[in-house]
């Protein structure tokens, strides 16, 4: 835990929407009278029929029900496109930066309107109507945003499947939600490599024996693909046959907007269901206040639209606010490790939102690739996806932002729809590694294992005591699983699945998933804490920590460590790291086993697959489960070969 504090400079407080006093009064109003607070802020989007009911929610066991603005009628595409046409039709809505630096495209709000309406007409002509599900399996190209908004325009429900998922994973998701139409591309491009998207779609449909009537194929690479007459059509040919006028369907606030599948701790992926009104109000409001978005800013979130961050903070939040949002097809280190910083300079990006794993991997390459670029346009930095260790936070602040850009370290989940705990740049002093304070209307509590609410400075499990507008409504087709997963552990409260520490200032520090907690000799140890200690060592680039069975302690600590470029793994360094962690946290946190690894198993979105690391640490690598989402499967073979916990020396 870092004890450094960065106070809010007066220029941040003066320029931002909210300073500390304003935050305190708005937050108090939001939790003391949520009906009045959200009744007012719900008006930030346009309604065809204004709501008269604001909040109708229950977390009671057996009666979990979440409704916001339930009698209001609106349309998400209308709010993200049409309502901007009169005042900013010629403003750029989407800057697209391709995988290759010589490909980019600017799309104005007027052009966006035309593209969305044409695709909506293509879908409607193929029988897609309100309530139908459409699966989107596309790379990070503008058509992904067009497809989302075209579905929303019709009141259809989109289910985006990340382009890195295998045909098996795609098939499961298509079958679960009953999609009748899939929008895909011939191939994707990522880091100069082609991804066979259309071939994957064909393989997925073959697995589920029909049900998919239409496949719309964007020509991204021009690669040759099989096209089934009557089912498959090229996007450009279909949109050339229709007009660019399509009325926006009148949609109830509680009608579904999208399903997004997220991994469950057990069983098949959960279809997280988000609805229309509350979700858009929350995505829009959090985007404005947390990123301090002002008209004219160029905003870039580096996520993929296949993840919730891409839904809320590339497409829906920014476009609802009339922003200019940047979509990036590529990866941080292609064609060079300066790519992020080159894109920032090329497009004069003001607000930059990325993941700690990207920051750590770029740290590994040193400061020179950053410092050879200007980055003078940057005003604010953000972090999302996992707790950011203080060392990476400090590097991001010092090297990337040159100590002039606040960092918003945002905590939220697929299930929450938008950011729940975060600094506000003009209001919140910053502590490296802390997500700081709750956003308006969010009521976090820290509870012990029995569910007792802890007061003051404490450590325990993070729950949310009451609903907020962006909250998921159910697991698609399985409300019982929704209640069981999120509301049964601590009845009457939403259980986040994360551990949390609250300090004397009331700031929240996310300590990692509760299933990423190791119990060492009866002491609970958050893996994120041990990882932070390891990564604070100057020779360590990245670390992942898991538990493994230990005869005496119950669980031991197994650390996978990736070193900085040029550093050699030695027995001396191994001992040095054990001593380092002992000093940083205490003897209880000493790693029992340290495995030096050239890389860690990550999904294509950059998340470390800890499940695989746990299996290898337990010497159970024969049953690694689904590894189809791995960015580099070769990493796993190296980890297995060099594992430190072999059952016998000859293994």
From Swiss-Prot:
Q: Which GO terms describe its biological process?
A: acetyl-CoA biosynthetic process from acetate
Top-level class of the enzyme under EC nomenclature: ligase
* Entry's family note: Belongs to the ATP-dependent AMP-binding enzyme family.
Q: What is its EC number?
A: 6.2.1.1
**A GO term from the CC aspect:** cytosol
| Residues the record lists as N6-acetyllysine modifications | 607
Cofactor names:
Mg(2+)
Q: Which UniProt keywords apply?
A: Acetylation, ATP-binding, Ligase, Magnesium, Metal-binding, Nucleotide-binding
What chemistry does it catalyse, as a reaction equation?
A: acetate + ATP + CoA = acetyl-CoA + AMP + diphosphate
Q: Where does CoA bind?
A: 190-193, 309, 333, 521, 582
Sum up the protein's function in the record's words.
Catalyzes the conversion of acetate into acetyl-CoA (AcCoA), an essential intermediate at the junction of anabolic and catabolic pathways. AcsA undergoes a two-step reaction. In the first half reaction, AcsA combines acetate with ATP to form acetyl-adenylate (AcAMP) intermediate. In the second half reaction, it can then transfer the acetyl group from AcAMP to the sulfhydryl group of CoA, forming the product AcCoA.
Q: What is this protein called?
A: Acetyl-coenzyme A synthetase
Binding positions (ATP): 385-387, 409-414, 498, 513, 524
Q: Which organism is it from?
A: Xanthobacter autotrophicus (strain ATCC BAA-1158 / Py2)
The entry's comment on post-translational modification says: Acetylated. Deacetylation by the SIR2-homolog deacetylase activates the enzyme.
Kindly give the SUPFAM superfamilies that the UniProt entry links to this protein. Acetyl-CoA synthetase-like
Q: Where does Mg(2+) bind?
A: 535, 537, 540
Question: Which domain of life does the UniProt lineage start with?
Answer: Bacteria
Q: Which GO terms describe its molecular function?
A: acetate-CoA ligase activity; AMP binding; ATP binding; metal ion binding
